[in-house]
Amino acid sequence: MNCAVGGRSGALLDTPRLSPASTNPRRFGSHIERLKSVGESHQPMTSLGTASAAPGEVDTGRLPIGETRDGARAGLPVCVINGDEAGKTLYIQAASDGDELNGVGVVRELVPQLDPTELSGTILVVGIVNVYGFRVAEHRNPIDDTKMNRAYPGDEHGTSSERIAAATFEAVQRADLALDLHQGSTSRMIHETRVRCGPRHHLHDECLSLAKTFDCGHVLDQKGPDGQLARAAPDEGIPTIDPELGGAVGLDPESIDTGVEGVMNVLTAYGFLDGEVTNGEQTRATGFEQYGAPAGGLVDFELDLGDSVEQGDRIFRVTDAFGRVKAETTADVDGVFWRTRRLPQVATGEYVCSVGTDVDTV
């Protein structure tokens, strides 16, 4: 398949290689020493697209996905971090929704922090999945007007989004666990991790454990729509979660820090890095109650994100431009104040906020 994970023969462009072995002898040893360590290590050379790293190395490249409208070859930015010692493989991807940049921010902060000589196993990273949406700051892939996280496991002969999904899913299938970094688009949302395989899935407990290890403080444990990576990958035996890193226009430093800490928790707990992880108790919701505007105007919220909600609590009110109250909305259920729209102006029936329901602790 043309867009499959491959070696360097399919190079798309002259992507700069990270060459720590040749540029930093103190850290990685001489070329001869590195070749010797490769021969002695049980860890193999690892490639993803045009990126290829020996044990103790990092490399970046491109994962082919076809051609653009002017016939230029197109690819996703990828990185391979290949540890000195054998171990598990972690797959990480970001920006399958093109306007969700916090995951890209996590990758940008995380990769320079990781020393492959101190790592057991391999990390495969796709830094930007929806490259077409990313380039124009759109949520969906503008080539086929598709939400990328509804296209998995993909089709190598299908639409643009299906081909991208197929190329990345082939990499996912090489992993022992996977993180699909998201956020609540440009709305306001708490930090949470999503378990999307469904409570009856044979990997549910493994996915929930991974979500608890990431430790955002909140978990949404609810079967997701068809086509989500966190639904498709568990069907192949790979525990996978969607960390949802708040919601922002652009990059949010607090959410990025939360994401980096979450990935480091996973790397430590699953044996990629030395150390111990102690996770706190987390709030889990298994459903949502959404609220729309009963009238047009401007919304004022009565609660902060993460607040506990009791049935009958006033959640928001709608006023006109002169401050006159037109409508008030109270909670129908108990739960957690989970997500809100970012802009205050609303039309009748327009989405305003969500309350996480059926709440317990895990």
PLM region spans:
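Structured catalytic-domain cores with a bias toward divalent-metal coordination
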Residues: N2, G10, D14-T15, P20, ...
